[in-house]
Amino acid sequence: MHQRILILDYGSQVTQLIARRVREAGVYSEIHAGDVDDAFVRDQVAQGLKGIILSGSHASAYEEGSMRVPAAVFDVGVPVLGICYGMQSMAQQLGGTVSFSDHREFGYAEVRAHGHTKLLDGLADFTTDEGHGMLKVWMSHGDKVTELPPGFKLMASTASCPIAGMADESRGFYAVQFHPEVTHTVQGKAMLARFVKDICGCEGDWNMPDYISEAVARIREQVGSDEVILGLSGGVDSSVAAALIHRAIGDQLTCVFVDHGLLRLDEGKQVMQTFTENMGVKIVHVDATSQFMGKLTGVADPEAKRKIIGREFVEVFQDEAGKLQGAKWLAQGTIYPDVIESAGAKTGKATSIKSHHNVGGLPDTLNLQLLEPLRELFKDEVRELGVALGLPPQMVYRHPFPGPGLGVRILGEVKHEYAELLRRADAIFIEELRNAKDPASGLTWYELTSQAFAVFLPVKSVGVMGDGRTYEYVVALRAVQTFDFMTADWAPLPHPLLARVSSRIINEVRGINRVVYDVSSKPPATIEWE
């Protein structure tokens, strides 16, 4: 079993980033709800847990009814790192004082490190004229610790937060008011690596080659000689899941690829070629375009479209799965963020922005056991796994594509005509991004953007082509840059590139005479339009 770190989640929007940073240090980490009981914590320690991290929260640590850290966390003898709310809870439960701050801090701050602690010693972004080491960090808090618990010493401070970090090194307890997990905290990654390796004693035994060997053995043991079916979408997650399961059990796996008529240009052909010709995976290809388009006729509401597409996918998949009499397992490309979000939804601590298109309702309907070989991995780890399994890099590293496909990139009602126009416009945009290089970085603009796509707007505008007047549709281009997809900035594509894309779309896609570029960031906008 791998050495691991337990992360207790108190509702922060960036808790997943803590786990990702820990794994980037080569250490396995798991996120669990912050209200687990003492028995759970003790059991984790008995299984070799090396340390605990307490996340931030939107809640107030001193308000009645706020979530408390399990008492066992502080008496099982493993190092603990509290972040933001985690620091306040640690202080309050160990005898310190937490108060509401008259000066709330949200955003960039400069923190002065105090004393010499294992966590911060030698880390600095710049030094003041007086010789004080300073850290550039990201703050997001309204409460603050105003009195240290017994045994703790001051570790960091800001002008408005005299206690921005504290430590009881004899017990391995550390806490910071800022967020080391976000990229805005320049030394944050180094801090978390130092905590898990130098303080918790983890050796960094989490790596992809070992994961593949363990996952293959686990799948073989779990499945035995049974047949497995998998809904293959062509997306990264289901593709990597298929490759991993096929590595483990070969022809015991059958993939069902449902074409709902809302895929990108030639996507169906590419999926079939990759898996059948190059990897020898058994695939049942179902063209259900007419069924999906028929159900979407007259439907304009985006949430209604998502639900219809999800429901019809289940129906088509169920019909095909029923023909595979020997199948006892349903495989899904569930990844770790899906697991975390599902847990949050069940506890009522998560807010639903958009419904997710998946096959989550299938196990009960089909009476199949569930196989989720990627449920421990984040997206970047899934991509790394895909490359290690031999999937083409252009498939593994391509931009995310929503389950409902072009159905949520066509605003309003979905029509076959609209899908054809959008497919061709989108293909031109992506082709030009792949061909255009940024001289400064040497990377293509496709590599420099995290997600890029075209959106069909069901409105017409007047134009002129040759000597004639046109009255045709509008397409919007969307390209964003992001580290985590929780926030995103619109990509500053070069004007000549945008001009070339626009010219090609208008000249090559008859029916479109205007192209616009979306310069909205997330928030307030979401990345997808629907």
From Swiss-Prot:
Catalyzes the synthesis of GMP from XMP. PANTHER family: GMP SYNTHASE [GLUTAMINE-HYDROLYZING], GMP SYNTHASE-RELATED. The active site is at 84 (nucleophile), 179, 181. It comes from Bordetella pertussis (strain Tohama I / ATCC BAA-589 / NCTC 13251). Residues 4-205 form the Glutamine amidotransferase type-1 domain. It holds the Pfam family GATase. CDD domains: GATase1_GMP_Synthase, GMP_synthase_C. The gene is guaA. Pathway: Purine metabolism; GMP biosynthesis; GMP from XMP (L-Gln route): step 1/1. This is GMP synthase [glutamine-hydrolyzing]. ATP binds at residues 233-239. Keywords: ATP-binding, Glutamine amidotransferase, GMP biosynthesis, Ligase, Nucleotide-binding, Purine biosynthesis. Its EC number is 6.3.5.2.
